[in-house]
Curated annotation (Swiss-Prot):
Family: Belongs to the eIF-3 subunit F family.
Species of origin: Drosophila persimilis (Fruit fly)
SMART domains: JAB_MPN
One MF annotation (Gene Ontology) recorded for this entry: translation initiation factor binding
Gene3D superfamilies from the UniProt entry: Cytidine Deaminase, domain 2
Entry protein name: Eukaryotic translation initiation factor 3 subunit F-2
């Protein structure tokens, strides 16, 4: 769909869920990634030309070149996420891409060419969200690329603004009102950790304190502030050699896997507890 096809009756409707998903992706980005981008999904009404942007997901990418004018996308990840999204919501199609930043990036032309092939319904849209909070607002804009140039000469693309409305359905209104009420409440103190997680935290702190003690002892020996003790040295050697040599990345993966298993067990136990409580209440209602 080109810009010329947009008339007064044509609208781009943006669901608030998309904004929250972009903010979540921006907050969870890696430290060396300044901005995030991803694929927009939505529904295109063929007769009215109305486009509803209902969903999105971030895409792994790498910027390079002068002024980051070139971009490499993880196409396999993008295709896998698109397949999963369409299994859950088959009516949603690719309608464009989103990115964070203050202005349209230099790589927007390459992204437009890629998403033009992905969009079977027409021209891809570009949603730009300014996360710098200038003026205490998160400015969000929608662009559409328009071909420019003269016949027989150099041609290019110009990204022009399109009118956009944020669409609130009944569930969205209920959720936004609840969030508004929660924001008006005074901040709450952080709740206590679950007993299982407290044990992990306490054990980690205990190990950290003992490691600090060992490091101070070794540094004092090396700096000749303390006389070496062969008995202590042999004991430390036996302790250190008893620990298997594991790469940092592998250890991190093993620890995170065990932590996920623990959290999954806690979640399942909580669900079973709630299920039993509901069953008990339903049984009492039937008996009454």
């Amino acid at each position: 769909m080109s810009l010329s096809n947009f008339n007064l009756q044509s609208k781009v409707l943006l669901h608030p869920l998309v904004l929250f998903q972009i903010i979540d992706a921006y907050e969870r980005r890696a430290k060396d990634v300044p901005e995030v981008l991803g694929t927009l999904l939505g529904i295109v009404a063929g007769k009215t030309g109305r486009i509803e942007i209902t969903n999105c997901f971030s895409v792994v990418h790498r910027m390079h070149g002068d002024n980051n004018c070139h971009i490499d996308l993880d196409l396999k990840y993008d295709n896998d996420m698109l397949e999963l999204a369409q299994i859950a919501y088959p009516q949603e199609k690719v309608v464009g891409w989103f990115s964070t930043g203050k202005a349209v990036s230099a790589a927007a032309v390459e992204l437009h060419e890629y998403y033009e092939r992905q969009c079977h319904s027409g021209q891809p849209l570009h949603l730009l969200m300014d996360t710098s909070l200038r003026g205490q607002r998160m400015n969000t804009r929608i662009f559409c690329a328009v071909a420019t140039g003269v016949p027989g000469g150099t041609k290019g693309l110009m990204f022009s603004l399109l009118p956009m409305d944020i669409y609130f359905g009944s569930p969205d209104i209920v959720a936004m009102r609840h969030m508004g009420r929660q924001c008006a409440l005074p901040p709450k103190e952080a709740g206590r950790l679950l007993p299982e997680l407290e044990q992990v935290v306490d054990a980690t702190k205990d190990i950290q304190q003992k490691l600090d003690l060992v490091l101070r002892y070794i540094n004092d020996i090396l700096n000749r502030k303390r006389r070496p003790d062969n008995t202590v040295g042999r004991a430390l050697h036996d302790v250190l050699t008893s620990v298997p040599m594991v790469e940092a990345e592998r250890f991190r993966h093993m620890f995170n896997t065990n932590m996920r298993d623990l959290l999954m067990s806690l979640t399942l136990s909580s669900m079973i507890k709630v299920q039993l409580q509901l069953s008990e209440r339903l049984s009492n209602m039937v008996d009454a």
